[in-house]
Regions:
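Short, charge-rich amphipathic segments
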Residues: 26-28, 49-59, 148-164, 173-180, ...
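Active-site-adjacent loops and short helices of periplasmic peptidoglycan-processing enzymes
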Residues: 1-147
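Structured C-terminal helix/loop/strand segments within mature extracytoplasmic catalytic/sensor domains
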Residues: 1, 172-175, 179-342
Length: 342
């Protein structure tokens, strides 16, 4: 069994569902919530100004055209359509929203570099989470699997990376990110390789390398994190409010074919072959309590993974868990029967 699922209402004594919630699993994008927390703290302390404008070219240097790196172009197109990009620049606040709402991996890498890895790692450490929970630059992580100056095969890299201490791996990824974003021969070689031949790593090897190197996450811990965020107890109320403003989106009346008892959803999610990750809360109208859903799935068969991606089955499942009380009860009953062999 390779699925963690926690469904809970804010203020409730017990969760509706707590299925393998304490398992540590590799997760896609969800660790950006730690980045968001560090950003909100930096703003509150006067270290970063949300209205400061950033050259789009500075952000695009972090974009690597490889699997798991496709969110940035679509995000930029949406930001242009919204008028958030003028004279080829945008505010830090818009970049943060692009990271959280549009899955912009280049924006996430830029923000991590701007805040500094030590600051984000300190946020993780203050929560008492394991070292592997800290996000790393996605561009450098992908290059740690394979780059033009590497002789090792993907299988050999997997052996090395599995045994490597997290601190050493983090430094390697940060160094690769720095080399890639700087002007020079290494960047030119990487861009040429990716343009001509891709990453030269099979889908099966990419899946194994991702599970070995992505940040880990615990559904129970992220559910507690989101609970604190909704209760204004994640840092100061101002920090919590800034985080929510970057996360929340209103819900259309036609979602899942009909109106939902939900006013807004704040979520971070991601997928990579074999992995699906989702951490979200729903603000619901009184007297309904706000709801939290966190799920991490790993080792999905590739055929099943792509079927879920093509049909949107995963998204529909999570939205129903956020909004449909009867569906939550049915899911809880089904999981309980499975656990007892019923």
């Amino acid at each position: 069994e390779q699925t963690s699922l926690v469904v809970m209402d804010v203020g409730a004594a017990e969760p509706h569902i707590h299925h393998q919630g304490r398992a540590e699993r590799p997760a896609v994008n969800v660790s950006r919530l730690l980045l968001l927390r560090s950003y909100a703290e930096a703003v509150a302390q006067g270290q970063l100004a949300p209205e400061r404008r950033v050259a789009l070219a500075d952000v695009q240097r972090y974009h690597l055209k490889a699997r798991g790196q496709g969110g940035h172009p679509a995000a930029i197109e949406r930001l242009r359509g919204e008028g958030a990009i003028t004279e080829d620049s945008l505010t830090i606040a818009a970049l943060v929203r692009s990271m959280t709402q549009y899955n912009d991996e280049a924006a996430a890498d830029w923000l991590l570099a701007t805040l500094g890895y030590p600051a984000v790692d300190a946020t993780r450490e203050a929560l008492g989470w394991p070292a592997r929970a800290t996000p790393l630059p996605s561009s450098g992580r992908t290059l740690s699997w394979r780059h033009p100056r590497m002789d090792a095969t993907p299988a050999e890299r997997l052996t090395v990376l599995t045994a490597q201490p997290r601190s050493a791996y983090a430094q390697e990824v940060l160094d690769l990110t720095g080399a890639f974003t700087a002007s020079g021969s290494f960047r030119d070689e990487v861009l040429t390789l990716v343009q001509e031949r891709g990453t030269e790593i099979s889908l099966r090897d990419q899946r194994a390398l991702a599970q070995a190197t992505y940040p880990t996450a615990c559904a129970t811990e992220y559910a507690a994190f989101l609970t604190a965020l909704l209760q204004d107890s994640l840092g100061s109320p101002a920090v919590s409010a800034r985080m929510r403003s970057a996360l929340e989106r209103t819900v259309g009346a036609d979602t899942l074919g009909g109106p939902l008892p939900v006013e807004a959803i704040g979520s971070v999610s991601g997928a990579f072959p074999g992995l699906i990750s989702f951490a979200a809360y729903a603000r619901r109208p009184d007297p309904l309590p706000d709801r939290i859903v966190v799920s991490f799935i790993q080792d999905l068969p590739i055929a099943v993974f792509y079927h879920m991606m093509q049909t949107g089955m995963d998204r529909a499942l999570f939205v129903r868990l956020l909004s449909d009380d009867a569906y939550v009860e049915d899911t809880a009953r089904f999981l309980a029967e499975r656990e007892t062999g019923g």
